[in-house]
């Protein structure tokens, strides 16, 4: 085991503070509408230019191990805020820096660190409760677009495209961000339920120009097993032929003579039919078949519930307005399922999302949720160069997280104003002793830091602006983009309450713990020997290289 170096008390905290400030100073340069960019070196390819706080934080590693520990702890604040709300990383870093700087001054002045921490915790709880009171629900497209715009560093085109995507696929819909091929951002929406399985035979295609099989007003037969024997299918096929409607078969697989017979019937025009494999595997396949059944008002034919293909009737089949199959995907549009059943299924899946611990399962469950509740939208990010594309894509993802958070917990006035208004909640707050009161006062100063930093980045005088904002009421604040004062919500400067709350909670949690640090332990840096090869002691003569005659 390598030797360790231990630092105590002030000397440890000073080193830690250096690391905190290096990281936070780099990150906070990006805050606000007039925040600057940070250029990150990459081991290969062009450097990356970013205004995303967490991207900057992730790049920073310091040579001095004690300083690095301070930097890594603040990095954790940014990551924690990012994990919970997907945005607010820069704000969280600025808050953490303010808490640590103010807190370590108080510790150096002889205050009890544990009481300071208790004071900070008490004030945090009060401010979080007040932020919830300040929050207004965010339901209309205009507010959603404004939240997206602010999060994407005042880029209104990003805010508008996210608002449009949310309007089209609903609040529960899945919105994914991909790299586009043009200069403009594009939005494409898949309405209805789409799953990644295509037709089992190209002979099902009835639109050769687009290479798709399209069924209008079809019946859907959902089967939880392989179908290889056509005899099992005959009763259903005859009933469907009499009804004169097309049929889509969704089964674990359709093979052999069953598939051949379906193809022949389809080509002769006896029954218009198409077959597709069920999506997913194992238990997930059963769950997804059940989703399709609920969406279309059908029943899954499964031996587990005592149903077999031979006994299946038209009552067991689902209905949809249209089904489109191509080589890779199947889309079911306007299933005829009961709204109450769909809502119950959505609630059940939402409960599973809350209960699961696996990120993979959570993602798959959310996909199922979106397919049932709305649809899937894809935002294709357009840019002139690869470097710009990466930077823009990161901003779109941030803005998307922010708008989701806004829909979830509402919005508060942006630009650091919500913190200043929430201070009323702790104006009368008292701790159990003087040191706790110092902790409360310390947080009171720290929550002004985001507003101060926004003003500094905009080239203004922070103290003057903070004072003026404090004199105002409600949503009155400072618009750094236009250097004006006014109603933040009317000017469209909104922050999601969830982002604001989780930024403070992450900063207070880690910041207050850092104040209570008394010792730091790190490995002793080894002095590596100077580079270069060892002395070769004069490489003697190479002898006569005689006898090289016969070489051509």
UniProtKB/Swiss-Prot annotation:
Enzymatic reactions: ATP + H2O + a folded polypeptide = ADP + phosphate + an unfolded polypeptide
Keyword list, A-Z:
ATP-binding, Chaperone, Cytoplasm, Isomerase, Nucleotide-binding
- Note the InterPro entries from the entry: Chaperonin_Cpn60_CS, Cpn60/GroEL, Cpn60/GroEL/TCP-1, GroEL-like_apical_dom_sf, GROEL-like_equatorial_sf, TCP-1-like_intermed_sf
**A biological process from GO:** protein refolding
**Quaternary structure, from the entry:** Forms a cylinder of 14 subunits composed of two heptameric rings stacked back-to-back. Interacts with the co-chaperonin GroES.
The name on file for this protein is Chaperonin GroEL
The EC number on file is 5.6.1.7
Does the keyword GTP-binding feature in the UniProt annotation? no
GO MF annotation list: ATP binding; ATP-dependent protein folding chaperone; isomerase activity; unfolded protein binding
Q: Does the keyword Lipid metabolism apply?
A: no
Task: State where the protein is found.
Answer: Cytoplasm
Main location as per UniProt: cytoplasm
């Amino acid at each position: 085991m390598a030797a360790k170096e231990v630092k105590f008390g002030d000397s440890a905290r000073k080193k830690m503070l250096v690391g905190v400030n290096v990281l936070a100073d780099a990150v906070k340069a990006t805050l606000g509408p007039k925040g600057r960019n940070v250029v990150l070196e990459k081991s290969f390819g062009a450097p990356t230019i970013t205004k995303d706080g967490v991207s900057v934080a992730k790049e920073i590693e310091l040579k001095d191990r004690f300083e690095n520990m301070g930097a890594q702890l603040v990095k954790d604040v940014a990551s924690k805020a990012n994990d919970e709300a997907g945005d607010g990383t820069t704000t969280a870093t600025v808050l953490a820096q303010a808490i640590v700087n103010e807190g370590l001054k108080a510790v150096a002045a002889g205050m009890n660190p544990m009481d300071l921490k208790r004071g900070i915790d008490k004030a945090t709880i009060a401010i979080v409760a007040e932020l919830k009171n300040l929050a207004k629900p965010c339901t209309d497209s205009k507010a959603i677009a404004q939240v997206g715009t602010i999060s994407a560093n005042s880029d209104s085109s990003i805010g508008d495209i996210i608002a449009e995507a949310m309007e089209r696929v609903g609040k529960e819909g899945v919105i994914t961000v991909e790299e586009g091929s043009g200069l403009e951002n594009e939005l494409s929406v898949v309405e209805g339920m789409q799953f990644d399985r295509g037709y089992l035979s190209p002979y099902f295609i009835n639109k050769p120009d687009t290479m798709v099989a399209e069924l209008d007003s079809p019946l859907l037969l959902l089967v939880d097993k392989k179908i290889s024997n056509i005899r099992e299918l005959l009763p259903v096929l005859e009933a469907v032929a009499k009804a004169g409607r097309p049929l889509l078969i969704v089964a674990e697989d359709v093979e052999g003579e069953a598939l051949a017979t379906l193809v022949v019937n389809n080509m002769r025009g006896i029954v218009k039919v198409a077959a597709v494999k069920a999506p997913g595997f194992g238990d997930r396949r059963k769950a997804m078949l059940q989703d399709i059944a609920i969406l279309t008002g059908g029943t899954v034919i499964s031996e587990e519930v005592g149903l077999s293909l031979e006994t299946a009737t038209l009552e067991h089949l689902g209905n949809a307005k249209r089904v489109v199959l191509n080589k890779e995907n199947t889309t079911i549009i306007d299933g005829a399922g009961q709204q109450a059943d769909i809502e119950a299924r959505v609630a059940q899946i939402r409960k599973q999302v809350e209960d699961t611990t696996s990120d993979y399962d959570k993602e798959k469950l959310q996909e199922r949720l979106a397919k049932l509740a709305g649809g899937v939208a894809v935002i294709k990010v357009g840019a002139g160069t690869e470097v710009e594309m990466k930077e823009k894509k990161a901003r779109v993802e941030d803005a998307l997280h922010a708008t989701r958070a806004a829909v979830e917990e509402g919005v508060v006035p942006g630009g650091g104003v919500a913190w200043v208004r929430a201070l009323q909640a702790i104006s009368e707050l008292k701790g159990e002793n003087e040191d706790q009161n110092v902790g409360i006062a310390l947080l009171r100063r720290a929550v002004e830091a985001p507003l101060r930093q926004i003003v500094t980045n905009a080239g203004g005088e922070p103290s003057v602006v903070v004072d003026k904002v404090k004199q105002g009421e409600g949503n009155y604040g400072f618009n750094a983009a236009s250097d004006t004062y006014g109603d933040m919500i009317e000017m469209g400067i909104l922050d999601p309450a969830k982002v604001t709350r989780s930024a403070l909670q992450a900063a207070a949690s880690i910041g207050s713990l850092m104040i209570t640090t008394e010792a730091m332990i790190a490995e002793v840096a080894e002095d590596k020997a100077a580079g270069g090869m060892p002395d070769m002691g004069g490489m003697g003569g190479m002898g006569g290289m005689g006898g090289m005659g016969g070489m051509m």
